[in-house]
């Protein structure tokens, strides 16, 4: 056989649902790569003969290979920090109180409007490097810290540039409807008009976004405004998604499902009717335990209902300066299990196959299947559950992206 590389002495957590074993596991396995794709995988005993002198062979020393991790919800590009608000919350102020007093998202907006593209790029690069060291091979990056046309475009341009200069694939999301800027404080409908009539066309003209998101909440955008933005995005051919049911149950998830959204994110206050709507539409539920933890929330997402109705559950970092300043997907695996009571298998699926579904890229990445992109990680672990069980020592040994070895952890 003519391959570009072969990995032996490994176990595979394929996350392939057609394999009945937990994690889609194949033990004592091998995997071969050709032209950036997975060319063969299976038990080592069934590996076809190949020329070991001409093909690089990597020995995994009994470790586990998983699909590359996918962080499907981040706000990775921002300037400044909100440590002062952290102190205020510890003294009793709520997220909503801080936001209504001019803090929260608006304070980050001010910093991002003042920062230039070079500064934002360098900040984003450092954060993307941190995720990459934990085995992340695809990341979604939202705008939403500009709230004016110029700065929203600036953030999205930086995100696109990061994708061009980093081995991690970057999917971009336009989140102009993240908050109402101070200049539109008494005219939120006017700001929605600006998003639809000026911002969105400018984003599309530069091909800066793969999807559009809205923060549907009573401190941000109501259902009618949300539907206007998402409908305009859908009419323009962009994927849609929604921040919904984080602080209250406004029915945003049902709206998103009706419009065919790829995902609804946060969903702590999602009810059974909303879960059923997601199930019927095939919309993913993105769980964000970092924000739940950092904001010291108590209302948990309806995990049992999501299981009952077969809604794909996704885990993501929600990395941002205000509610989840946690740049770690491995910690999300642990939090998903300890805080939300996911099983380790559900948690890993939420950062691989289901995360790919939330971004509409599951045909190419998210599981180890012949013909899919060769994005995978070798972990120094005895069982896949160990990824969620233990935190603090990074077990990521090697990362392959598009068939190329891009990271070796010595």
From Swiss-Prot:
Binding site for Fe(3+): 73, 75, 243, 318
Compartments, as annotated in UniProt: Cytoplasm
Protein's name according to its UniProt entry: Imidazolonepropionase
UniProt keyword Phosphoprotein present: no
Cofactor binding note from Swiss-Prot or TrEMBL: Binds 1 zinc or iron ion per subunit.
Alphabetical GO biological process terms: L-histidine catabolic process to glutamate and formamide; L-histidine catabolic process to glutamate and formate
Cross-referenced NCBIfam families: hutI
The entry's keywords: Cytoplasm, Histidine metabolism, Hydrolase, Iron, Metal-binding, Zinc
PANTHER family the UniProt entry points to: IMIDAZOLONEPROPIONASE, IMIDAZOLONEPROPIONASE-RELATED
Pfam families: Amidohydro_1
Binding site for Zn(2+): 73, 75, 243, 318
The encoding gene: hutI
Domain of life: Bacteria
Reaction(s) catalysed by this chain's protein: 4-imidazolone-5-propanoate + H2O = N-formimidoyl-L-glutamate
EC primary class: hydrolase
Chain residues that bind N-formimidoyl-L-glutamate: 145, 320, 322
EC number: 3.5.2.7
Function, in words: Catalyzes the hydrolytic cleavage of the carbon-nitrogen bond in imidazolone-5-propanoate to yield N-formimidoyl-L-glutamate. It is the third step in the universal histidine degradation pathway.
Cofactors: Zn(2+); Fe(3+)
């Amino acid at each position: 056989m003519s391959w570009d590389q072969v990995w032996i002495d490994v176990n595979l957590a394929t996350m392939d649902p057609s394999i009945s074993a937990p994690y889609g596991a194949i033990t004592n396995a091998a995997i071969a790569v050709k032209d950036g794709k997975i060319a063969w995988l299976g038990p080592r005993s069934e590996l076809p003969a190949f020329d070991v002198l001409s093909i690089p062979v990597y020995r995994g020393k009994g470790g586990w290979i998983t699909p590359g991790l996918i962080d499907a919800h981040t706000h990775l590009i921002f300037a400044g920090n909100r440590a002062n608000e952290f102190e205020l919350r510890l003294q009793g102020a709520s997220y909503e109180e801080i936001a209504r007093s001019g803090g929260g998202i608006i304070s980050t907006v001010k910093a991002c409007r003042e920062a230039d593209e070079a500064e934002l790029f360098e900040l984003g690069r450092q954060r993307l490097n941190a995720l990459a060291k934990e085995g992340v091979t695809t990341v979604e990056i939202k705008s939403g810290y500009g709230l004016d046309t110029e700065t929203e475009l600036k953030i999205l341009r930086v995100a696109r540039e990061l994708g061009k200069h980093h081995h991690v694939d970057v999917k971009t999301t336009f989140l102009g409807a993240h908050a109402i800027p101070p200049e539109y404080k008494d005219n939120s409908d006017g700001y929605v008009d600006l998003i639809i009539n000026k911002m969105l066309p400018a984003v599309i003209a530069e091909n800066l976004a793969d999807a559009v998101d809205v923060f549907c909440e009573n401190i941000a955008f109501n259902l009618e405004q949300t539907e206007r933005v998402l409908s305009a995005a859908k009419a323009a051919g962009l994927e849609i998604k929604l921040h919904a049911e984080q602080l209250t149950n406004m029915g945003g998830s049902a709206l998103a499902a009706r419009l065919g959204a790829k995902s609804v994110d946060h969903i702590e206050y999602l009810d059974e009717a909303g879960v059923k709507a997601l199930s019927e539409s095939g919309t993913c539920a993105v769980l964000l335990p970092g924000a739940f933890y950092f904001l010291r929330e108590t209302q948990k997402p309806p995990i049992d209902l999501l299981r009952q109705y077969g809604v794909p559950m996704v885990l993501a970092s929600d990395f941002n300066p205000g509610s989840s300043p946690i740049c770690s997907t491995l910690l999300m695996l642990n939090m998903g299990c300890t805080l939300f009571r996911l099983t380790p298998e559900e948690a890993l699926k939420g950062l691989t196959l289901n995360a790919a579904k939330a971004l509409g890229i599951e045909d190419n990445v998210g599981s180890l299947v012949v013909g899919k992109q060769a994005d995978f990680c070798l972990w120094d672990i005895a069982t896949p559950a160990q990824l969620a069980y233990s935190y603090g020592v990074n077990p990521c040994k090697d990362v392959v992206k598009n068939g190329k070895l891009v990271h070796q952890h010595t």
